């Protein structure tokens, strides 16, 4: 039994032609080559017809739909870009106008403040010049009073010095004229 199994296996495992040569692969047999070409042609024609009638129109429709979607998206993107460019230009124009208004307001405020400061400075100068004139008058009157006191003190001192040195009382007119001459020169 074991032998018959081995023989059976060997007989079915190898297909040999007469004389011990192997048979060629069936698609390469010369006898069936023409019928295989006809079968292939029929299969490719059928495949082409099915593809061209069913699959290719669907693919073409999908490609056309995608192309239209892309064109629509590009057109919408261009429109949005144009709108954003217009909005940007309007924003820049508004910004420039706002800057110009701010500059004008700043200049106007600066001029008002400068005018107010100038008016206040002039008023202060006038008040100071009045105070200065009053101070000069006060100084002059104080100087005159001090000088008159100095003249009296100098006369008294000169009289006391001469009296101390000489022992005699000098003439008050001579002392006054000597003090006046000394104060002038």
UniProtKB/Swiss-Prot annotation:
| UniProt GO molecular function | proton-transporting ATP synthase activity, rotational mechanism; proton-transporting ATPase activity, rotational mechanism
Q: Where is this region: Disordered?
A: 1-25
CDD domains recorded for this chain?
ATP-synt_Fo_b
Q: Does the keyword Ribosomal protein apply?
A: no
Gene Ontology cellular component list: plasma membrane; proton-transporting ATP synthase complex
Keyword field contains DNA-binding: no
Its membrane topology is listed as: Single-pass membrane protein
UniProt keyword terms in alphabetical order: ATP synthesis, Cell inner membrane, Cell membrane, CF(0), Hydrogen ion transport, Ion transport, Membrane, Transmembrane, Transmembrane helix, Transport
Spell out the subcellular localization from the entry: Cell inner membrane
Into which family does the record put it? Belongs to the ATPase B chain family.
Q: How does it assemble?
A: F-type ATPases have 2 components, F(1) - the catalytic core - and F(0) - the membrane proton channel. F(1) has five subunits: alpha(3), beta(3), gamma(1), delta(1), epsilon(1). F(0) has three main subunits: a(1), b(2) and c(10-14). The alpha and beta chains form an alternating ring which encloses part of the gamma chain. F(1) is attached to F(0) by a central stalk formed by the gamma and epsilon chains, while a peripheral stalk is formed by the delta and b chains.
Function in brief: F(1)F(0) ATP synthase produces ATP from ADP in the presence of a proton or sodium gradient. F-type ATPases consist of two structural domains, F(1) containing the extramembraneous catalytic core and F(0) containing the membrane proton channel, linked together by a central stalk and a peripheral stalk. During catalysis, ATP synthesis in the catalytic domain of F(1) is coupled via a rotary mechanism of the central stalk subunits to proton translocation.
Q: What is this protein called?
A: ATP synthase subunit b 2
What is the organism of origin for this protein? Nitrobacter winogradskyi (strain ATCC 25391 / DSM 10237 / CIP 104748 / NCIMB 11846 / Nb-255)
> What's the gene?
atpF2
């Amino acid at each position: 039994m074991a032998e018959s199994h081995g023989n059976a296996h060997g007989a079915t495992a190898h297909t040999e032609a007469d004389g011990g040569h192997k048979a060629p692969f069936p698609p390469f047999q010369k006898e069936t080559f023409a019928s295989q070409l006809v079968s292939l042609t029929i299969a490719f024609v059928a495949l082409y017809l099915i593809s061209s009638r069913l699959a290719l129109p669907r693919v073409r429709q999908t490609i056309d739909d995608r192309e239209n979607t892309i064109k629509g998206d590009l057109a919408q993107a261009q429109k949005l870009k144009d709108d954003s460019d217009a909005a940007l230009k309007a924003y820049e124009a508004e910004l420039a106008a706002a800057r110009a208004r701010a500059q004008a307001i700043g200049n106007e405020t600066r001029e008002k403040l400068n005018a107010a400061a100038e008016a206040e400075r002039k008023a202060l100068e006038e008040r100071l010049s009045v105070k200065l004139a009053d101070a000069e008058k006060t100084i002059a009157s104080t100087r005159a009073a001090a000088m008159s006191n100095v003249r009296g003190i100098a006369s008294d001192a000169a009289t006391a010095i001469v009296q101390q040195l000489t022992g005699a009382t000098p003439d008050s007119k001579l002392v006054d004229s000597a003090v006046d001459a000394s104060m002038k020169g």
